[in-house]
UniProtKB/Swiss-Prot annotation:
Occurrences of domain Histidine kinase (ranges): 535-748
Function (record text): Photoreceptor which exists in two forms that are reversibly interconvertible by light: the R form that absorbs maximally in the red region of the spectrum and the FR form that absorbs maximally in the far-red region.
Origin organism lineage: Bacteria, Bacillati, Cyanobacteriota, Cyanophyceae, Nostocales
Residues covered by region (Chromophore binding domain): 20-510
UniProt source species: Nostoc sp. (strain PCC 7120 / SAG 25.82 / UTEX 2576)
Keyword ATP-binding assigned: yes
Stretches assigned to the GAF domain: 152-320
Single GO MF descriptor: photoreceptor activity
Protein name according to UniProt: Cyanobacterial phytochrome A
UniProt-annotated binding residues for a tetrapyrrole: C259
Modified residues (Phosphohistidine): H538
Family: In the N-terminal section; belongs to the phytochrome family.
Length: 765
């Protein structure tokens, strides 16, 4: 009876992670004993000793190993056990008397499990497949010679399975490689002509789940001589010392999981031999040998295959590195150029995107983005900047590693499906908690050939009222169209991204130190300059007043005695003194913006505006100016400075009016964390090329004959806004009026603003 897995609410994950190594069962072709050192007392034994040793299991338990073996063998074993490395005695030949003078010879293998118990495994010694060392050496040498003749990794893998099949004489030999997601695929196969090919087929992670893969790392070679044989139970089931099932992680006789045996049965496999290919302590792949019928593999042949597997995989690793070498060297060259470009630019981002090769070339991506603070610099084909804001926030909340990469971003971040055409793949490196460098790859629709439906890796049988998980029975070709995926990121590309991260962090840190030093020097210089301007303005007032007084006295007393030229000269002197007094007053006002502590308090903007309009009432009346405003908020600001700001901006709008009467409007808009104010007029306008220059001290766009003034008004406005941690700018076209914008943060950091200090550099926050 078949039932659906989901409808029964079965926890498939827990079943896949069952502790196989604690099953307490072994395969029937050998005997396993659990010994307690140092006396080698037999604590547990497999329940098949009568058929193999001719001794009942009950007669062995609680005895010592010396009761089974002669003193010579015990002495040899004790010597090997004391050496510290059990490989020196594995395997060792053991003779056990069965009846009378009838002895049986066994291959004995020792190991200590995680609990510290000594495990002894006995297999009948079969000599017909014994491979002497020199024969094996020549076999390995011949295989390697064949392998070294191949041109690429794919051909190399095909030679591997051919050579292993020659050695083992199995009906089918496959090389199975794992993907990063745990799925696997057959990349090489050698088989009987009558068998259906598995080459190129993919298999889901559930076929070889994580616990099984961990055991393949612990046991680099596994043999199942008869997949139909009944497993043998250990007796007693629990170790009498630990009161737990014995740990058989490293046992060569350990029985396979029932689910795996049924899986082999469904594939028509009678025996299997598996050689693990391990790289950097991870399971890279397997050489899987299948036979249609039962097939025993001697210990010597297994060790030969294990050694051959290690030699072969060393060559595989070398081939992989060789095939990656040219690409890796090219990426290293690109990386060194990018570091050089970044070092030469004031802004390191320019070094990544303005030159060739660029950031895209480092990972063979179609798009990239450098997101620093609230700004993203884009290159190539990327999602929109507003989409990247949310993506970076997701990375910040969910990723803690130094690098994040995926070839199916929509699977982990569903919002990315909207821009799958440019960003189905993502490689991201954090420069800090809020700053990222991102690379993107577009969707590549693929057809994957599976060995059976990957969406139905298990079936459920319900017999006698019991629900039992069992593997699928169908391994027919099942084609799947895979969407929302990109080409995978290669290991060398990920490493290159990590190396670039280190370089960027070093450059940013160095630039931050340089900027901090420059800021310190500039702050000191500005402080000295402001102090000088303040003192100089003060000290110049008195002599200038004397000059003004004497010139006016000269004009009053001798006006009738002087000719027209002399009177004109006196007029010029009076005007010059007046201009100088205005200039000194403006310089003094400019210096006071920073030198006098601003009294930050909740200020009604409308009241500050009213005071400014009151100071300008005469000019407003003379020009017929019409001034309107939106409802204005209350902000944390210096009321006097806010009044001066409006007064300067409105005075400018009146001064630089067109032929029409001035129309001036003050607007206010609440943004996320600041207020945006605007002062719009219908005056003569400003050429956009001068939009920055007008805020520089003493800068004028017109002569004094055209418009009076010192060029200080907008510079003072800029200083006031900077003290409030805001921004000020102008948008205008010549002849079309101008709109001045400025911002003031919502709320306030009163102490920070009062002290005139900048917030801590948040580059690495």
């Amino acid at each position: 009876m078949r039932i659906d897995v989901e409808s029964q609410n079965i926890n498939v994950t827990s079943l896949k992670e069952a502790p196989i190594h604690l099953s307490g069962q072994i395969q029937p072709h050998g005997v396993l004993l659990v010994l307690e050192e140092p006396g080698l007392k037999i604590l547990q034994v497999s329940n098949n000793t009568w058929g193999i040793l001719g001794i009942n299991a009950e007669n062995i338990l609680q005895k010592k190993l010396e009761d089974l073996l002669d003193s010579f063998q015990i002495e040899r074993i004790q010597s090997g056990l004391s050496s510290g490395n059990l490989e020196f005695i594995n395997p060792t030949k053991i003779w056990i008397r069965k009846k009378g003078d009838d002895y049986a010879v066994f291959d004995a293998v020792f190991h200590r499990n995680t609990e510290g118990f000594l495990i002894l495994e006995l297999e009948p010694a079969i000599t017909q497949e014994n491979i002497p060392f020199l024969s094996f050496y020549h076999l390995a040498k011949a295989s390697i010679n064949q392998l070294q003749k191949t041109a690429n990794l794919r051909d190399f893998c095909q030679i591997i399975v051919q050579e292993v099949r020659k050695v083992t004489d199995f009906d089918r030999v496959m090389l199975y490689k794992f993907d990063d997601d745990g799925h696997g695929s057959v990349i090489a196969e050698e088989k009987l002509d009558s068998l259906e090919p598995y080459l190129g087929l993919h298999y889901p992670e559930s076929d070889i789940p994580k616990p099984a893969r961990k055991l393949f790392i612990s046991n680099s070679i596994r043999v199942i001589p008869n997949a139909q044989a009944q497993a043998i139970q250990m007796i007693p089931a629990l170790n009498p010392v630990s009161d737990r099932p014995v740990d058989l992680t490293n046992s060569i006789l350990r029985s396979a999981a029932n689910c795996h045996l049924e899986y082999l049965h469904n594939m028509g496999v009678g025996a299997s031999l598996t050689i693990s290919l391990i790289k950097d302590n991870k399971l890279w792949g397997l050489i899987a040998c299948h036979h249609l019928s039962a097939k025993y593999v001697s210990y010597e042949l297994r060790k030969a295959c294990e050694f051959l597997g290690r030699v072969i995989f060393a060559e595989i690793s070398a081939r992989e590195e060789t095939e990656d070498y040219d690409y890796r060297m090219n990426l290293t060259h690109i990386q060194s150029l990018l570091v050089e470009y970044m070092s030469q630019e004031d802004n390191f981002v320019d070094g990544l995107i303005k030159h060739q090769p660029s950031l895209l070339d480092l990972t063979s991506a179609q798009g990239a983005a450098v997101c620093f603070g609230d700004h993203c610099t884009l290159i190539g084909e990327t999602p929109k900047a507003e989409d990247l804001v949310f993506l970076v926030q997701w990375l910040k909340n969910n990723v803690e590693e130094e690098v994040f990469y995926t070839d199916s971003l929509p699977q982990v971040y569903p919002d990315a499906e909207r821009y799958k055409n440019v960003a189905s793949g993502l490689l991201a490196i954090p420069i800090s908690q809020r700053n990222y460098v991102l690379w993107f790859r577009p969707e590549v629709i693929q057809t994957v050939n599976w060995g059976g439906d990957p969406n139905q890796p298990f079936e459920v049988n319900k017999l006698d009222g019991n629900v039992r998980l069992c593997p699928r029975k169908s391994f027919e070709l099942w084609k799947e169209t895979v969407r929302l995926t990109s080409l995978p990121w290669r290991y060398v590309e990920i490493r290159a991204a990590l190396e670039l991260r280190k370089a960027i962090v070093n450059i940013v840190l160095r630039q931050a130190d340089e900027l901090a030093q420059l800021a310190h020097d500039l702050e000191r210089s500005n402080a000295e300059l402001k102090k000088f301007a303040y003192v100089a303005s003060h000290d110049l007032q008195e002599p200038l007043n004397q000059v003004a007084n004497y010139v006016q006295l000269l004009e009053m007393r001798y006006q009738d005695q002087l000719d027209a030229d002399a009177n004109e000269f006196i007029t010029f002197a009076v005007e010059g003194v007046s201009l100088m007094q205005t200039l000194i007053d403006d310089v003094l006002a400019y210096s006071k913006v920073d030198t006098q502590a601003i009294a930050f308090q909740l200020t009604e903007v409308e009241k500050a505006l009213d005071k400014a309009l009151g100071n300008l009432r005469q000019r407003i009346a003379e020009t017929g100016a019409n001034i309107t405003h939106d409802p204005l908020p209350t902000v944390m600001a210096g009321s006097t400075q806010l009044m001066q700001l409006f007064q300067n901006l409105i005075a400018n709008a009146i001064k630089f009016r067109s032929e029409e009467a001035p129309q001036i409007h003050i607007g206010a808009e609440r943004l996320e964390d600041e207020w945006l104010f605007s002062v719009r007029d219908n005056g003569i306008g400003i050429d956009p090329q001068f939009s920055d220059r007008i805020f520089v001290i003493f800068q004028r766009l017109h002569t004094r004959d055209e418009y009076h003034g010192t060029g200080m008004g907008l510079a003072i406005c800029k200083k006031i806004i900077e003290c409030h941690r805001g921004r000020i700018w102008v948008e205008s076209q010549l002849g079309e009026g101008a709109t001045f914008y400025f911002t003031i943060p919502v709320g306030g950091r009163e102490r920070e603003r009062r002290n005139g200090r900048k917030t801590q550099n948040n580059l690495f926050s």
